[in-house]
Amino acid sequence: MIDFDNRTDYEFDINKLNDIYNLLTDKDIELILTDDEEIKELNSQFRNKDKATDVLSFPLEAMPGMPLGSIVISIDTAKKGAEEFGHSVDDEIRLLFLHGLLHLLGYDHETDNGEMRAKEEEIIKKLNLPSSLIVRNED
């Protein structure tokens, strides 16, 4: 189950994430949709980066019955990404959710040998989503 906390005025149908969620996990996940100001504070506090970002993931310890973790997405940055790459804001949120969920599942594109990129591309092709974050950020 996805526990959705929308802290913005943007109306997003959480059911648009069910296909990604069902392909990757059956664990509970918290999803927070926020703005650049709040995500900047979190990024500074937890990653020592004093800037807004698109998505943050906070995994929880692997304990039976516990949620997998939390994903925080900035709607402000998602809107910019959607405009820059020519797709809908909803598709950008789906991409960010996929990226964040893969991090919760233990993937790390900064340290792995392409496993996260391959998994992200596999899901993107299966669900006919726009280009992945990893591929976009490598250009």
UniProtKB/Swiss-Prot annotation:
<keyword id="KW-0862">Zinc</keyword>
<dbReference type="Pfam" id="PF02130">
    <property type="entry name" value="YbeY"/>
</dbReference>
<keyword id="KW-0690">Ribosome biogenesis</keyword>
<dbReference type="InterPro" id="IPR023091">
    <property type="entry name" value="MetalPrtase_cat_dom_sf_prd"/>
</dbReference>
<keyword id="KW-0378">Hydrolase</keyword>
<keyword id="KW-0255">Endonuclease</keyword>
<keyword id="KW-0963">Cytoplasm</keyword>
<feature type="binding site">
    <location>
        <position position="109"/>
    </location>
    <ligand>
        <name>Zn(2+)</name>
    </ligand>
</feature>
<keyword id="KW-0698">rRNA processing</keyword>
<dbReference type="GO" id="GO:0004222">
    <property type="term" value="F:metalloendopeptidase activity"/>
</dbReference>
<dbReference type="InterPro" id="IPR020549">
    <property type="entry name" value="YbeY_CS"/>
</dbReference>
<dbReference type="GO" id="GO:0008270">
    <property type="term" value="F:zinc ion binding"/>
</dbReference>
<dbReference type="GO" id="GO:0005737">
    <property type="term" value="C:cytoplasm"/>
</dbReference>
<dbReference type="GO" id="GO:0004521">
    <property type="term" value="F:RNA endonuclease activity"/>
</dbReference>
<feature type="binding site">
    <location>
        <position position="99"/>
    </location>
    <ligand>
        <name>Zn(2+)</name>
    </ligand>
</feature>
<keyword id="KW-0540">Nuclease</keyword>
<keyword id="KW-0479">Metal-binding</keyword>
<comment type="function">
    <text>Single strand-specific metallo-endoribonuclease involved in late-stage 70S ribosome quality control and in maturation of the 3' terminus of the 16S rRNA.</text>
</comment>
<dbReference type="InterPro" id="IPR002036">
    <property type="entry name" value="YbeY"/>
</dbReference>
<feature type="binding site">
    <location>
        <position position="103"/>
    </location>
    <ligand>
        <name>Zn(2+)</name>
    </ligand>
</feature>
<comment type="similarity">
    <text>Belongs to the endoribonuclease YbeY family.</text>
</comment>
<protein>
    <recommendedName>
        <fullName>Endoribonuclease YbeY</fullName>
        <ecNumber>3.1.-.-</ecNumber>
    </recommendedName>
</protein>
<dbReference type="GO" id="GO:0006364">
    <property type="term" value="P:rRNA processing"/>
</dbReference>
